[in-house]
Amino acid sequence: MAVKVPLGPTYEEMLYPNRQPLALREKARLARTHDELDPHNLFNITWKDDVGKVNSLVFPPELTGLDANIVVMLGKDFPSGSHKVGPAYSTLIEGYVDGDILPDRHTILGPSTGNFGIGVAYICALMGYKGVVIMPDNMSKERYQRIRGYGAELLLTPGSESDVILTLEKTHELQKDPANRALAQFELLPNYRFHRYVTGRSAIEAVQGIGNGRIACFTSAPGSAGTLAAGDEIKMAFPEARVAALEPYECSTLATGGLGQHRIEGIGDKMCTLIHNVLTTDFIVNIYDEETVQGLKVLRDGTDLLVQQGVDRDMAEFMRDCFGPSGVCNVIGAIKMAKYLKLGPGDNVLTIATDGFDRYHSVLDEMQHRYLGLEKHVMERWVKDVFLNADENLIFDVRRQEQKERLFAQKERDWLRFGYSREYLDSMKDMAFWNEEFARIADYDEKITRLRG
């Protein structure tokens, strides 16, 4: 007899949790505060709070020096502490309703550098699957602790964030065993579907009542590039919107082919991922990795300094837990793009904080060992250098056709070796490919609803 799997929300119910059946919604609210491993937490996979408002903040203008607004959607309130749980769930539930991923037959593989792996471990715990997370061996220790805490096995490959290609190679090797199924975030389209529909439409809601209520620019640093899919939906609502992909200056793969090591966990993985729709990426922006950690230190430990800068104390206190290095990277990129595009009063730049500070204590501990002293004047300088003085340098315009062809060629180099055909890769050069994949949401929602009964 087949093992019964706890079924979670449809895509529509992740976007609009108030459309979930009332009894399920009430159980999910209770589970959120009482039992992290209650399967009803699947219904808490949403950008929204209990009253239906998108979890977000307007980054203090006292730190940006801008007339434009920097609106930051907050991923820390998702189950497991990161929005990456959304694509992990979407990929698993699609596989389950298609009959391809079954808990009594298959082990789940989760290639990751951290947050997606945490999400995979968490979803496997809630839905009754055995999970194996494959990730580099030099990430923050909090990541490993969370994954093991959810009961998944860890399989570590050499290196750090920039060495994720080794995790992909290991994952493809393990997939030769028919008992293994990979939630392959870098290559499978549920990741794209979740972020285009759930994140993209939540972003459109997040700016309502702020400035002119529109989005002039969306910035996001790609790891898998799933989050960048939100830009496709943002452009449907606001055709004038620009999409900027951010990456570490030290690993400027998309901009210049750079393949160096860097400190920003979760992004900059030395590839053009398969699910990255480069057609809708307008700019690539390089961010210095050390500035993201300096900015994190300011937001975490510089509350009094921020208040002296004019930031409301309640906001300064709130922001202490809202960011990791990649979130700071996204804010820096948003400031740079606002200046580059010469945005003014009423204009909004929308960006994402993937997770919160809870998994980065060790990152700041390591920082303490690299600096002889972190006196007040040092952090005062960082406020200016990281945020207020973020400039328009290292911004690359990739809107011209020759730039698109360069990125397509890079994607071919990265993915032909993993068995994808040139014909399939060529199909991604047409927006029809992405729209057809997006349109599959309705079919999956119907399947999930039918199986849930």
PLM features: residue spans?
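PLP-dependent amino-acid enzyme catalytic core
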Residues: 1-453
